Swiss-Prot record:
Family, per entry: Belongs to the UPF0210 family.
Gene3D superfamilies: 3.20.70.20
Classification via HAMAP family: UPF0210 (MF_01221)
SUPFAM superfamilies: PFL-like glycyl radical enzymes
InterPro entries attached to this UniProt entry: UPF0210
Subunit description: Homodimer.
Family annotation (Pfam families): DUF711
Protein name: UPF0210 protein NGO_1297
């Protein structure tokens, strides 16, 4: 890869003035060779493999950050879904495995570890059910472990038994962790991807290599600055500006990923070029949409503006790297985006509008706080709605929702750090309890028959 001096100067400006960073270098680690019928042996094997494969990740990231002057905010680990790896133990709880993941991740200094996960889009094995029922206690007793559940896909339909259990799991987690914080580490997916470097939904897919490096970049501030400084008038010209900016962002991520791959002697997997916001002013996806001409994010036209942004980011990234993967689009996590927080507090950005936006953007309903008395079946209904959008449109959708115990609409909750803070948003008054309790499976749509 040849880098021109002009690109270097542009990158310096992006970092210094526009909050550009490499959000994460994530090592995916396969744990199939750790399997044992003895859960204590399994835990020791898992600890040994993670601390061996990941031991140099943090030092490598610091070296590359200093060498290129680009902040690398997080170093993370993702592992094979634990429901698969722990099945042979026949244990009635996998909390000890979550605690092992936590211990191993802390030992090597990473910020998060993902993969306390179950893939149940078509049905739940006994091990899947044990894992999901272990999630609340696992989130309570660990600090940096993330959990995900894939409850649907375009090929399989939606597993409504798993949707019901996921809603109950989130509700229980909210009840036993301070201000529901444990729920910030749980994602429920439809069409989950196997190479996602972002938390909380990262896991290492079964079709992946023994270890692989996946990189996530982030540059909402860069895109907004590019639009502010351009003379684009029509939306066609706006799309072109975004596309060219995404190209530049992706080039930096590609460079960091391939350098990390060489230093760690681990294959480079994918570059996820999602625009991931932070609560910092100047690092907001919502403000990009407003720069296009919306008075406030969430008003009419927001979904169209987001569709333009998401598509232009993908097109620019594809030209800059042959290894684009993961989720690659625009994230809309309410608590992590200063502009979305403001729009939600103003009452313009609602749960319904966010759901519409998820039909055209990178993932789904993300980091949304709801009242603590929201019933489990309502959470399951929200998950089912979001999964339906993903299933029908053959895209990844997800829900990361936090019922905040003791809080109601109009209150706010502080999560801190990259997770920011969120106003508590209302859920619908009507009940979907009978619908959710029917269980079974929503059949795969006609779009699933592609062969």
């Amino acid at each position: 890869m040849s880098i021109q001096s002009g690109e270097i100067l542009e990158t310096v400006k992006m970092v210094a003035d526009q909050n550009f960073d490499v959000r994460t270098i994530t090592i995916g680690i396969d744990l199939h060779d750790c399997i044992s019928t003895d859960i204590d042996v399994l835990n020791q094997n898992i600890y040994n493999k993670i601390t061996t494969v990941g031991k140099d990740l943090v030092a490598t990231a610091k070296h590359l950050s200093a060498k290129y002057g680009v902040p690398i905010v997080n170093q993370r680990i993702s592992v094979t879904p634990i429901a698969q790896i722990a099945a042979a133990t026949k244990a009635d709880s996998y909390v000890s495995v979550a605690q092992t993941l936590d211990k191993a991740a802390k030992a090597i200094g990473v910020s998060f570890i993902g993969g306390f996960s179950a893939l149940v889009q078509k049905g739940m094995s006994p091990s899947d059910e044990v894992l999901i029922r272990s999630v609340p206690e696992a989130m309570k007793t660990t600090d940096i472990v993330c959990s995900s559940i894939n409850i649907g896909s375009t090929r399989a339909g939606i597993n409504m038994d798993a949707v019901k259990l996921a809603g109950e799991t989130i509700k229980r987690t909210a009840e036993i962790t301070p201000e529901g914080f444990g729920c910030a580490k749980i994602v429920v997916f439809c069409n989950a991807v196997e190479d996602n470097p972002f938390m909380a939904g990262a896991f290492h897919g079964s079709g992946e290599a023994d270890a692989v490096i996946n990189v996530g970049v982030s540059g909402p501030g860069v895109v907004k600055a590019a639009l502010e400084n351009s003379d684009a008038v029509s939306l066609t010209e706006v799309a072109e500006v975004v596309k060219k900016t995404a190209f530049k962002i992706t080039r930096v991520g590609e460079l960091i990923g391939r350098e990390a791959s060489k230093m760690l002697n681990i294959p480079f997997g994918i570059l996820d070029l999602s625009l991931a916001p932070t609560p910092a002013v100047g690092d907001s996806v919502a403000r990009i949409l407003e720069e296009m001409g919306l008075s406030v994010c969430g008003t009419h036209g927001t979904t169209a503006a987001l569709a333009l942004l998401n598509d232009a980011v993908k097109k620019g990234g594809m030209m800059a790297s042959s290894a684009v993967g993961g989720l690659s689009g625009a994230f809309i996590p309410v608590s992590e985006d200063e502009g979305m927080i403001a729009a939600a507090e103003a009452g313009v950005l609602t749960l319904d509008k966010l759901e519409a936006m998820t039909a055209v953007c990178s993932v789904g309903l993300d980091m949304i706080a709801v009242p603590g008395d929201t019933p489990a079946h309502t959470i399951s209904g929200i998950i089912a709605d979001e999964a339906a959008i993903g299933m029908i449109n053959s895209k990844t959708t997800a829900v990361r929702i936090i019922p905040v115990t003791g809080k109601t609409v109009g209150d706010s909750v502080e999560f801190g750090g990259l997770l920011g803070y969120a106003p508590v948003m209302p859920a619908k008054e009507g009940s979907c309890e009978v619908f959710v309790n029917r269980g079974g499976r929503i059949p795969a749509p006609v779009q699933s028959m592609k062969n």
